């Protein structure tokens, strides 16, 4: 068996788009929400998600929050995000989260490490999304893709805290193809991925491999059901990379699960006092 990237990418993308749009419409309608709010970074995932939301619900039911940290976010990303929001005719708000993040540091009286501060930025954005969702009766649409979800490349209770994930069924490389099909500008569709949690952060540099490799490995492991050794042979990728992806998946299981609690039957009810 030989698995190539083309096996993942050879899709009817209009069919994929329509199927996701039906999912969006059905979920929003069943919730009773007035519409959705979504964070727009100017990257491929959030932009593709926004295009699908607008196609499914219409621009009048979509609120966009552009939430840069002016210490970290490149001006180009802000320009791209605002340009897309205006192009699609959606209502948007531009909120610099720098002073909000700074207020945490002042209250703490100490400086956290880079990763902790970066995750704080993601969690500040989450609180703003849910603030507007509460005020306006909206659902929070997530922008994570399947690659990120399976390897845990998101902030717990940050960008991972959402009501639903329209592109959570698509690998990153598939999202890029869908973006081009939907008419997302090429500069955004092909822009290197980055959570923008600290200056100069790039996803592939941090992960140590390209998303095309990650997607092939995930497809081999989770869609084809291959063992790590079989996946390495089928994809032609080093077994070390396969094991790295599998370890990322296992180590991030807590991000994809509800917090555990003791079993009431074993922990509570068996200690019921007997009368008489």
Swiss-Prot record:
Catalytically driven reaction(s): deamido-NAD(+) + NH4(+) + ATP = AMP + diphosphate + NAD(+) + H(+)
Keywords, ordered alphabetically: ATP-binding, Ligase, Magnesium, Metal-binding, NAD, Nucleotide-binding
According to the UniProt entry, its GO molecular function terms are: ATP binding; glutaminase activity; metal ion binding; NAD+ synthase (glutamine-hydrolyzing) activity; NAD+ synthase activity
* InterPro entries in UniProt: NAD/GMP_synthase (IPR022310), NAD_synthase (IPR003694), NH(3)-dep_NAD(+)_synth (IPR022926), Rossmann-like_a/b/a_fold (IPR014729)
**Binding positions for Mg(2+)?**
45, 148
What EC number is given for this enzyme?
Answer: 6.3.1.5
**What pathway is this protein said to act in by its record?**
Cofactor biosynthesis; NAD(+) biosynthesis; NAD(+) from deamido-NAD(+) (ammonia route): step 1/1
Similarity annotation: Belongs to the NAD synthetase family.
| Biological role stated in the UniProt entry | Catalyzes the ATP-dependent amidation of deamido-NAD to form NAD. Uses ammonia as a nitrogen source.
Protein name (record): NH(3)-dependent NAD(+) synthetase
Give the source species.
Hyperthermus butylicus (strain DSM 5456 / JCM 9403 / PLM1-5)
């Amino acid at each position: 068996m030989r698995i190539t990237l083309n096996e993942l990418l050879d899709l009817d993308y209009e069919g994929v788009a329509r199927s996701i749009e039906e999912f969006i419409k059905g979920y929003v309608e069943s919730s009773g929400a007035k519409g959705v709010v979504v964070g727009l970074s100017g990257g491929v995932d959030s932009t593709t998600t926004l295009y699908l939301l607008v196609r499914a619900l219409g621009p009048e039911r979509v609120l966009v929050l552009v939430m840069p940290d002016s210490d970290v976010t490149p001006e180009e990303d802000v320009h791209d995000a605002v340009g897309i929001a205006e192009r699609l005719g959606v209502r948007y708000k531009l909120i610099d989260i720098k002073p909000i993040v700074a207020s945490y540091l002042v209250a703490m009286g100490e400086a956290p490490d880079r990763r902790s501060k970066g995750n704080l930025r993601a969690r500040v954005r989450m609180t703003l999304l849910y603030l507007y969702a509460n005020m306006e009766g909206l659902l929070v649409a997530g922008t994570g893709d399947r690659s990120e979800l399976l390897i845990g490349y998101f902030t717990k209770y940050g960008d991972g805290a959402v009501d639903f994930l329209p592109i959570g069924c698509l690998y990153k490389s598939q999202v890029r193809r869908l973006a081009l099909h939907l008419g997302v500008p090429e500069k955004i569709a092909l822009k290197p991925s980055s959570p923008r949690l600290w200056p100069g952060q790039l996803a592939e540099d941090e992960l140590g491999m390209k998303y095309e490799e990650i997607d092939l490995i995930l497809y081999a492991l989770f869609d084809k059901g291959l063992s790590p050794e079989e996946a390495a042979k089928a994809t032609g990728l080093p077994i070390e990379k396969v094991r790295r992806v599998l370890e990322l998946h296992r180590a991030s299981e807590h991000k994809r699960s509800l917090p555990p609690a003791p079993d009431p039957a074993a922990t509570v009810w068996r200690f019921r006092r007997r009368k008489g």
